[in-house]
């Protein structure tokens, strides 16, 4: 194997006037595990496409080591539309599957027609299959399909959703075992156990990995290096995500006051990383006792500075925020919520977790009055002012620009109880300069999510309901949103799959714990996500607490 699996020398890449890479020189070690981070639009996906040979730099050299293989998971991966799920996954095994089929064919022929030629061919095939560790190929295939929750093997891929197609493509790619594995948001559309399996599989993967992801626990558990892309430059940091936070904070301190806000946010996130589980729980409980203090402090400081996301202070909350009492709610004859009771604390941040389709959004719609309970009650306090925008982003004119959607064409807008420059407000959500002039109809998933956030937080409520706000956000925006919530004097309820976000911000967890006996069962817990997971094991035992999916096994024999 060459010293480097991939090399870039003085690479420049631009899309029109936007420079993605500016005179970048990098070399990647064989077997290195690298997480790629940076703001949306920094060119993370473009770098993967160049390394996969799907795109070329404008200047400079970029090349794979001689004889090495490369594979990529794209955000919208191509599949063979004429084949089933299994047919596509088997393509990842390449000629190994052909050789295994031929070995079995030769074995059958030799039962009736033993010849030296067949014996020689069988010996050669056996040696190649031994080297490729291919004897349990079917078991490897079924294990990977199960671990990644692929659709049924005989399902035509033309029937699959976007998330299902990504799982099939990831499964196919992992089975192909390239020397350089390029992954663009690999944890998107995976459930918690599939993510855990993938982390363990990649941590022991013999080849090099470059993964673009906003999943910070994934970056902590898998990455040995972090490559940050920012304004055309590439900054490599040795270590995982926690180490990256520390080293970047040091770099910003050297750069001086220009990035003071960013440095402050990184320092606060780093302090959380360094604190133990008990300290995190203590801080979470302290927040619940500090509502009056935080509200008074926020009222004194009316000025909003939108270099980062900020949540405007809403009216003072009374003692009753939302009280849910023995709530039952179903849809199309299926029970989604059964006998659910909880009371929102007025300075609480509640994480709502569970797979897609179990009723999380239905719960939100019931709280805001868009759905009515089948039985039980939902009482919203008299002092509550809700901030909520439907996940479907209804009412956004696709022809309007991002700035027009948020500002209605006004230079100054009302954000909560304060008037602010509209372009500065929109800029805080990652829409800088010309990005504010993009028509809403052409936005990516992450951009639509940031626009939805801007519309929700602009309302100035004291109870904020956020439906999947962390989807498709870069780590910078995620950190900014976390800090904004932690500094917000009010109550927030957030549907999210982001484990880091749930751990860092939440005072409570509302978790779907449905099973065969009761698919509409929910559990209310005081504490963050990590504490909830420990509690679940204590209550239900290790086996019962784990989702009923395969535990990690390597895709090799031995």
UniProtKB/Swiss-Prot annotation:
Subcellular locations according to the entry: Cytoplasm
Catalytic activity: ATP + H2O = ADP + phosphate + H(+)
Induction: Induced by ofloxacin stress.
Highest taxon of source: Bacteria
Pfam entry (one): ABC_tran_Xtn
Function: A translation factor that gates the progression of the 70S ribosomal initiation complex (IC, containing tRNA(fMet) in the P-site) into the translation elongation cycle by using a mechanism sensitive to the ATP/ADP ratio. Binds to the 70S ribosome E-site where it modulates the state of the translating ribosome during subunit translocation. ATP hydrolysis probably frees it from the ribosome, which can enter the elongation phase.
Sequence similarity: Belongs to the ABC transporter superfamily. ABCF family. Translational throttle EttA subfamily.
Subunit: Monomer. Probably contacts ribosomal proteins L1, L5, L33 and S7, the 16S and 23S rRNA and the P-site containing tRNA(fMet).
Record protein name field: Energy-dependent translational throttle protein EttA
Species this chain originates from: Mycobacterium tuberculosis (strain ATCC 25618 / H37Rv)
Lineage of the species this protein comes from: Bacteria, Bacillati, Actinomycetota, Actinomycetes, Mycobacteriales
Gene name as annotated: ettA
């Amino acid at each position: 194997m060459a010293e480097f699996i991939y090399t870039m020398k003085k690479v420049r890449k631009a899309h029109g006037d936007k420079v993605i890479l500016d005179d970048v020189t990098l070399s990647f070690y064989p077997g290195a595990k690298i997480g790629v981070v940076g703001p949306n639009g920094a060119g993370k996906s473009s770098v993967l496409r160049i390394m996969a040979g799907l795109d070329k730099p404008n200047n400079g050299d970029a090349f794979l080591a001689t004889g090495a293989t490369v594979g990529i998971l794209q955000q919208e991966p191509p599949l063979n539309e004429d084949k089933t799920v299994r047919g596509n996954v088997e393509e990842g095994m390449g000629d190994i599957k052909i050789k295994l089929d031929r070995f079995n064919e030769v074995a059958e022929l030799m039962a009736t027609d033993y010849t030296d030629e067949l014996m020689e061919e069988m010996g050669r095939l056996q040696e190649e299959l031994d080297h490729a560790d291919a004897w349990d190929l079917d078991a490897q295939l079924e294990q990977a399909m199960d671990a990644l929750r692929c659709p049924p093997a005989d399902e035509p891929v033309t029937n699959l959703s976007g998330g299902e197609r990504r799982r099939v493509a990831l499964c196919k790619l992992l089975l192909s075992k390239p020397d350089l594995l390029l992954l663009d948001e690999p944890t998107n559309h995976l459930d918690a156990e599939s993510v855990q399996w993938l982390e363990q599989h990649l941590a022991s993967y013999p080849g090099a990995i470059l993964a673009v992801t906003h999943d910070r626990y994934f970056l902590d558990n898998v990455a040995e290096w972090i490559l940050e892309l920012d304004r055309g430059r590439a900054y490599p940091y040795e270590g995982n995500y926690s180490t990256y936070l520390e080293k970047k904070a040091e770099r910003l301190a050297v750069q001086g006051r220009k990035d003071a806000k960013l440095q402050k946010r990184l320092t606060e996130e780093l302090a959380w990383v360094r604190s133990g589980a008990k300290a995190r729980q203590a801080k979470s409980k302290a927040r619940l006792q500090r509502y009056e203090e935080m509200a008074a402090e926020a009222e004194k400081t009316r000025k909003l500075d939108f270099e980062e996301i900020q949540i405007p202070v809403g009216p003072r909350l009374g003692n009753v925020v939302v009280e849910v009492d023995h709530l039952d709610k179903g849809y199309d004859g299926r029970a989604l919520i059964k006998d659910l009771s909880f009371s929102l604390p007025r300075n609480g941040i509640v994480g709502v977790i569970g797979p897609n389709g179990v009723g999380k959004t239905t719960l939100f719609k019931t709280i805001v009055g868009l759905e009515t309970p089948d039985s039980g009650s939902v009482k919203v306090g008299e002092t509550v002012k809700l901030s909520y925008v439907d996940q479907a982003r209804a009412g956004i004119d696709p022809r309007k620009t991002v700035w027009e959607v948020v500002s209605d064409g006004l230079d100054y807008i009302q954000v909560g109880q304060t008037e602010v420059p509209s372009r500065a407000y929109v800029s805080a959500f990652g829409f800088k300069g010309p990005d504010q002039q993009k028509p809403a109809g052409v936005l990516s998933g992450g951009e639509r999510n940031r626009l939805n956030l801007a519309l929700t937080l602009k309302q100035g409520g004291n109870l904020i309901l956020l439906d999947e706000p962390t989807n498709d956000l870069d780590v910078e925006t995620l950190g900014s949103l976390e800090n904004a919530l932690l500094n917000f004097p009010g109550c927030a309820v957030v549907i999210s799959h982001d484990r880091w976000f749930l751990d860092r911000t939440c005072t409570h967890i509302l978790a779907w714990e449905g099973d065969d006996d009761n698919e509409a069962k929910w559990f209310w817990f005081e504490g963050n996500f990590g504490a909830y997971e420990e509690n679940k094991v204590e209550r239900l035992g290790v086996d019962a607490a784990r989702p009923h999916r395969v535990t990690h096994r390597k895709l090799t024999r031995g």
